[in-house]
From Swiss-Prot:
Protein name per UniProt: Cysteine protease ATG4B
InterPro entries listed in its UniProt record: Papain-like_cys_pep_sf (IPR038765), Peptidase_C54 (IPR005078), Peptidase_C54_cat (IPR046792)
EC annotation from Swiss-Prot or TrEMBL: 3.4.22.-
Active-site residues, record numbering mapped to chain: 164, 361, 363
Description of how the protein assembles with itself and partners: Interacts with ATG8.
Function according to Swiss-Prot or TrEMBL: Cysteine protease that plays a key role in autophagy by mediating both proteolytic activation and delipidation of ATG8 family proteins. The protease activity is required for proteolytic activation of ATG8 family proteins: cleaves the C-terminal amino acid of ATG8 proteins to reveal a C-terminal glycine. Exposure of the glycine at the C-terminus is essential for ATG8 proteins conjugation to phosphatidylethanolamine (PE) and insertion to membranes, which is necessary for autophagy. In addition to the protease activity, also mediates delipidation of PE-conjugated ATG8 proteins.
SUPFAM superfamilies given in the database record: Cysteine proteinases
GO CC annotations on file: cytoplasm
Segments of skewed composition (Polar residues): 1-15
Swiss-Prot/TrEMBL GO biological process terms: aggrephagy; autophagosome assembly; mitophagy; piecemeal microautophagy of the nucleus; protein processing; protein transport
Organism encoding this protein: Oryza sativa subsp. japonica (Rice)
Chief location: cytoplasm
Places the protein is found: Cytoplasm
Length: 478
């Protein structure tokens, strides 16, 4: 797929401004003077922008090639810039030319207060840019890779330009596993050795058939839904591929060692209460309970559950009526974010601020790495990113999928309560609804045949209305 414009600085690449790398100067006196001025400006920028997180764009200072009238002018400029940046009233995200205000950020169920009046005296408050960025940079970042073993019988040893949806989905599922094993408050440690569970999670997303949730195994599992090396796929097919892969892994592990590689039930939500096309997807409480029961091998106890809700919120562009509802899902404690992005370009949207979506970008190309499951001294830097990028919510592709993780029955009940309240705010056009039960003849968690959806996730022609079109404000299952 065509990647988003990469205007940011990779977290793994060195920034000459931050590290003080200055090109050598020539011997002429005029050039020495010019170089001295460049060094002065570089030092100023380094001081202003140097932080543990690369949150600023590294632009070449065009004024460095011009001789200022006096050094005091440079000092005044730096003092003003420092005051603006260090005040905390404004900050700049990579991937945009817009300086955002100090509005609250909602990030995977947590609210971060970024106001200029934020105080460090309240250690329990989720406030401050640094606190948010520590959370952001602790999320698992999975990108294009090159140099891995060929996928199946193909010759593909890289997923560059086509694997962004797969990588975005891996990020969402990885967060679910992090939340399950380590908790929502977990942050990436600064020193080794690392937590064995953290390393074990990264190992599962390695790029080989030996890794449970690798791109190799996802493509194999999603073959009947159109997943193939070199081809792009939509959110619905991606969710179904995960459903198949999780089921396959569970069956294999039960035969081999009796252990679960995926420690939760998986519910791909689709359809409506009557199993008909055209309505909002429905979370059925009885279906979720049955999936948990199946996960627990017939026991009635509840289990952790991952919900994936693939949606279409318009035709060529997202219908504006759904944007406030999408934003509110990030306030749910169970939020895992969204698989989405610009049309034809998938990203992992993990937060919102005002009318902007904050995302991790899978389009950076990195070399494939092999992190052994027991290597607690492994270099994990390529799985984390400190570059915050943003996108206007009204530019998001209408085809997307939302994820939620519920740890136990109480957490699931809280999710259902919040989802029901969201329905009440939807003015007749909800993202999805919640019901207790459905007709016995309907199998909502395995209803491709009922819905008339082909294996590749496309809608059959006879499902269109008499005019040959679907309503822009109606829901569809991809």
């Amino acid at each position: 797929m065509t990647s988003l414009p990469d205007r940011g600085v990779s977290s793994s690449s060195s920034d000459p401004l931050c590290e003080g790398n200055i090109a050598p100067c020539s011997s002429s006196s005029e050039q020495k003077e010019d170089c001295s001025l460049k060094q002065s400006k570089t030092s100023i920028l380094s001081c202003v922008f140097n932080s543990p997180f690369n949150i600023f764009e590294a632009h070449q200072d065009s004024s460095a090639n011009k001789s200022p009238k006096s050094s005091s002018g440079s000092y005044d400029w730096s003092r003003v810039l420092r005051r603006i940046v260090c005040s905390g009233s404004m900050w700049r995200f990579l991937g945009t030319s817009k300086v955002l205000t100090s509005s609250d950020v909602w990030f995977l169920g947590k609210c971060y207060k970024l106001s200029s009046e934020e105080s460090s005296s309240d250690s329990d408050s989720e406030s401050g840019h640094a606190t948010f960025l520590e959370d952001f940079s602790s999320r698992i970042w999975i990108t294009y890779r090159r140099g891995f073993d060929a996928i199946s019988d193909s010759k593909y040893t890289s997923d560059v330009n086509w694997g962004c949806m797969v990588r975005s989905s891996q990020m969402l599922v990885a967060q679910a596993l992090i939340f399950h094993h380590l908790g929502r408050s977990w942050r990436r440690p600064l020193e080794k050795p690392y937590n064995p569970e953290y390393i074990g999670i990264l190992h599962m997303f390695g790029d080989s058939e030996a890794c449970a949730f690798s791109i190799h195994n996802l493509l194999q599992a999603g073959n009947s839904y159109g997943l193939a090396a070199g081809s792009w796929v939509g959110p619905y097919a991606m969710c179904r591929a995960w459903q198949t892969l999780v089921r396959t892994n569970r069956e294999q592990h039960e035969v081999v060692d009796g252990n679960e590689s995926f420690p939760m039930a998986l519910y791909v939500v689709s359809g409506d209460e009557d199993g008909e096309r055209g309505g909002a997807p429905v979370v059925c409480i009885d279906v979720a309970a049955q999936l948990c029961c199946d996960f627990n091998k017939g026991q009635s106890t509840w289990s952790p559950i991952l919900l994936l809700v693939p949606l279409v919120l318009g035709l060529d562009k997202i219908n504006p009526r759904y944007i406030p509802l999408l934003k509110e899902t990030f306030t749910f404690p169970q939020s895992l974010g969204i698989l989405g992005g610009k049309p034809g370009t998938s990203t992992y949207i993990a937060g919102v601020q005002d009318d902007r979506a904050l995302y991790l970008d899978p389009h950076e190309v990195q070399m494939a790495v092999d992190i052994a499951a027991d290597n607690i001294e492994a270099d994990t830097s390529s799985y984390h990113c400190s570059t915050v990028r943003d996108l206007a919510l009204d530019l998001i592709d209408p085809s997307l999928a939302i994820g939620f993780y519920c740890r136990d029955k109480d957490d699931f009940d809280d999710f259902c309560s919040r989802a029901t309240e969201l329905v009440d705010k939807a003015n007749g056009a909800p993202l999805f609804t919640v019901v207790q039960s459905v007709q016995p003849s309907k199998q909502m968690y395995n209803q491709d045949d009922v819905l008339g959806i082909s294996g590749d996730g496309n809608i059959n022609v006879e499902d269109l209305d008499a005019s040959g079109e679907t309503g822009e404000e109606e829901w569809q299952i991809l």
